Amino acid sequence: MSNDFLFTSESVSEGHPDKVADQISDAILDAILAQDKYARVAAETLCNTGLVVLAGEITTTANVDYIHVARETIKRIGYDNTEYGIDYKGCAVLVAYDKQSPDIAQGVDRASDDYLNQGAGDQGLMFGYACDETPELMPFPIYYAHRLVERQSQLRRDGRLPWLRPDAKSQVTVRYVDGKPHSVDTVVLSTQHAPEMSQEAIREAVIEEIIKPVLPSHMLAETKYLVNPTGRFVIGGPQGDCGLTGRKIIVDTYGGAAPHGGGAFSGKDPSKVDRSAAYAARYVAKNVVAAGLARQCQVQVSYAIGVARPINITVYTEGTGVIPDEQIAKLVQEHFDLRPKGIVQMLDLLRPVYEKTAAYGHFGREEPEFSWEATDKVLLLREAAGLAGEPAKAFA
């Protein structure tokens, strides 16, 4: 790719139907983990007009009222009126959970010599990424796409824009010059709204109250704004589209700036490497960049079902590393335990912290529960790489 280019990422609000499904799945996971931290959970959700279906595989000693958890999640998001797309009070909730297959369980539970040799819950490949485009070490387009829909939710909830409804989407196109974010080329923001609102009033409020307070002002000189470009967005949420768990995997990660192994996160307990290893790969990549070993870092790990140790740990820095990629990969293997149980232990993942991850991105958020965002390996990595002193600030 040339060093001068346009790149686009999108995000969706907590009220988007797929995100409603993700949040219900993770709320159920949290409710189970609060009682049984060793539960096996694969909770899938479908939500449509007036209907929520809970299905998947759960093996647990916990006693959870799944229907109540689903309704409370829908209520928290803001769907308390059928006119908005679904009403938590009146929607039907169907429960169809089974137990985890014993064929899968035996591979995960089997340990050859110690606790840390629990096998992976499935085969697969996972990616982690970090770069110095933002202080949070996330790609600029996805970071700000998240902040836009987060702002939409804030203004809806605090009543400053009372005509906003829960469903919304954002898209940010950034112009890169010399490989760095230079300016915002285009912003698309579509938001569900009350039927009496005019397009002109919506456009003005969205630009002035949502977009401009979020994006860096010096990057907006020639920005094109597309607000509700269809002209009307009254029907939304699960009424506008059927929502399913796991359909926003690029929104959940890096907005297309890094590859994705294909496995979704929400509703899965941390024995599933789709989730836990992707979190660990982000932790590795962020520490590599924060340590000043590279300006960007992509980490790939892969697993075989029932086998504890990763098949591969591969690091790419796209020529930005101060030491060879192979040397960074060796440091990663020495200082990060990427066996499934090692990850759970390293990141303290047996906690009910997952519902918060299910909207506005799993990465690049300085939430106290997000242990995978810590940069506590920086000095260790620098010392092991033979670099003296504290790293320079990664974000330029």
From Swiss-Prot:
What this protein is called in its record is S-adenosylmethionine synthase
InterPro entries, per the entry = ADOMET_SYNTHASE_CS, S-AdoMet_synt_C, S-AdoMet_synt_central, S-AdoMet_synt_N, S-AdoMet_synthetase, S-AdoMet_synthetase_sfam
User: Care to name a GO molecular-function term for this sequence?
Assistant: ATP binding
Where is the major localization of this protein?
cytoplasm
Give the CC-aspect GO terms.
cytoplasm
- Organism the protein comes from: Ralstonia pickettii (strain 12J)
Question: What pathway, per the record?
Answer: Amino-acid biosynthesis; S-adenosyl-L-methionine biosynthesis; S-adenosyl-L-methionine from L-methionine: step 1/1
Query: Residues that bind K(+), according to the entry?
Result: 44
Its quaternary structure? Homotetramer; dimer of dimers.
Region described as Flexible loop = 100-110
Query: What Pfam family is a match, any one?
Result: S-AdoMet_synt_C
Entry similarity comment: Belongs to the AdoMet synthase family.
The cofactor required is:
Mg(2+); K(+)
Residues given in the record as ATP binding sites: 16, 167-169, 232-233, 241, 247-248, 264, 268
The free-text function statement in the UniProt record for this protein reads: Catalyzes the formation of S-adenosylmethionine (AdoMet) from methionine and ATP. The overall synthetic reaction is composed of two sequential steps, AdoMet formation and the subsequent tripolyphosphate hydrolysis which occurs prior to release of AdoMet from the enzyme.
Q: Which reaction does it catalyse?
A: L-methionine + ATP + H2O = S-adenosyl-L-methionine + phosphate + diphosphate
Q: Which UniProt keywords apply?
A: ATP-binding, Cytoplasm, Magnesium, Metal-binding, Nucleotide-binding, One-carbon metabolism, Potassium, Transferase
Query: What note does UniProt attach to the cofactor annotation?
Result: Binds 2 divalent ions per subunit.
Please list the GO biological process terms of this entry: one-carbon metabolic process; S-adenosylmethionine biosynthetic process
